[in-house]
Amino acid sequence: MNLRVKNKWIIGLTGTILSGKSTALAYFAKYGAATLSADEIVAQLYKKTAIQKQLKKWLGTTQKDQIAKQIFTHPGKRKQLENFIHPLVLKEGLKQIKQAKKKLVVFEIPLLFEADCDKMTDLNILVVADPKTLPLRLKGRQMSRAIYKARLKTQWPEVEKAARADIILFHKNKKDLGAKIKRFCEAFDLF
C-alpha cells in the first residue's frame, strides 16, 4: 500500500513513547496541516463489532488497558494483533488522506519505521524529547518507569529511527517543539 496521493504531501510523524508525537501533531494542525493519528484510528477500529469479536477471541478482552497489558508482555500476541490491525489502519488512513481538504497531511504513526510505513510517505519526521524531561513526562501520563521501559522495548531504539528519518525534531519542551514546527512550516510555505 502507498499513502501518497496526487497533489498532496504526506509526512509520516513518529517517535518513541512519550517523545511528544501527539503534541507535534497538534502543532502541525495549528499551523495549517491536515492531521491523522494511527492511535486514534485504532481506537475507532476497536469500537467495531467485528474487531471486538476478534480481540475477545485472541486476547479474551476488549478493554484497552487489558489489551495493552497483554501485548506489551507477550510478543506473540502483539505481533498477531499488529498483523491484523496495521492493514486496517493504513486503509482508513489512506481514505482520510484522500478526503483531506489540505495539501499537507501529517500522519502520526508510532511504529512508522518498524512497520515500514516510512516507504509510503513523502517525508518522515522523528520527534525526540530531551531525556532530562522524562520524569515530568512520565508523571504527566501517570505512567510508571517499569511500564514505560516495557513499552519502549517494543519499539526500535531512537538511534535506529534517526537513521531512517528525513528530519529529526529534537525538543526541550512543548514551547520549543511548537516553535520548531512553526519554523518548519514557514520554511516549506505549508500554511
Predicted feature descriptions by range:
Residues 1-65, 70, 179-191:
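Glycine-rich phosphate-binding loop of ATP-dependent small-molecule kinases
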Residues 7-8, 101-103:
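Short, high-confidence coil segments that cap the C-terminus of an alpha-helix
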Residues 52-56, 131-139, 149:
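An amphipathic alpha-helix signature
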Residues 94-98, 104-140:
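ATP-dependent NMP and nucleoside kinases share a basic, alpha-helical "lid"
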Residues 101, 119-120, 143-188:
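Small-molecule kinase domains that catalyze NTP-dependent phosphoryl transfer to phosphate-bearing small molecules
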